[in-house]
């Protein structure tokens, strides 16, 4: 799989699925699986039975990984989804939003 242009800490917009349109910050990138974990998006509930460590039991809610193609980097200018281009500025490679031309990092 090609290297992802989405990095940990990026602000992203969900493009499809039950959370379409939501924005969040990337908590984890899994390039080998082609998935990302976005804070507050794609929440799942895990029902836990009471055990020795957790005598109460209960429901744990956490973010599940989602396919990297379902998210796009949010444009720093207006927050809408944009593609990312890599340019060289001052001898360093930086990521640039295609829509606005703003640098995402660097």
From Swiss-Prot:
InterPro entries associated with the record: KOW, Rib_uL2_dom2, Ribosomal_uL24, Ribosomal_uL24_CS, Ribosomal_uL24_KOW, Translation_prot_SH3-like_sf
SUPFAM superfamilies cross-referenced by the UniProt entry: Translation proteins SH3-like domain
Pfam families hit by this protein: KOW, ribosomal_L24
Keyword terms: Ribonucleoprotein, Ribosomal protein, RNA-binding, rRNA-binding
Annotated GO MF terms: rRNA binding; structural constituent of ribosome
GO cellular component, one term: ribonucleoprotein complex
Biological process per Gene Ontology, one example term: translation
PANTHER family for this protein: MITOCHONDRIAL RIBOSOMAL PROTEIN L24
Assembly behavior: Part of the 50S ribosomal subunit.
Function: One of two assembly initiator proteins, it binds directly to the 5'-end of the 23S rRNA, where it nucleates assembly of the 50S subunit. One of the proteins that surrounds the polypeptide exit tunnel on the outside of the subunit.
Family: Belongs to the universal ribosomal protein uL24 family.
Protein's recorded name: Large ribosomal subunit protein uL24
Species the sequence originates in: Erythrobacter litoralis (strain HTCC2594)
């Amino acid at each position: 799989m090609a290297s992802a242009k989405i990095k940990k800490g990026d602000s992203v917009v969900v493009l499809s699925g039950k959370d379409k349109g939501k924005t969040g910050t990337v908590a984890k990138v899994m390039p080998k699986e082609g998935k990302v974990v976005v804070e507050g998006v794609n929440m799942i509930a895990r029902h836990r039975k009471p055990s020795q460590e957790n005598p109460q039991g209960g429901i744990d809610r956490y973010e599940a990984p989602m396919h990297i193609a379902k998210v796009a980097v949010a444009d720093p200018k207006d927050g809408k989804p944009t593609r990312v281009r890599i340019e060289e500025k001052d001898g360093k490679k930086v990521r640039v939003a295609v829509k606005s031309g703003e640098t995402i990092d660097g």
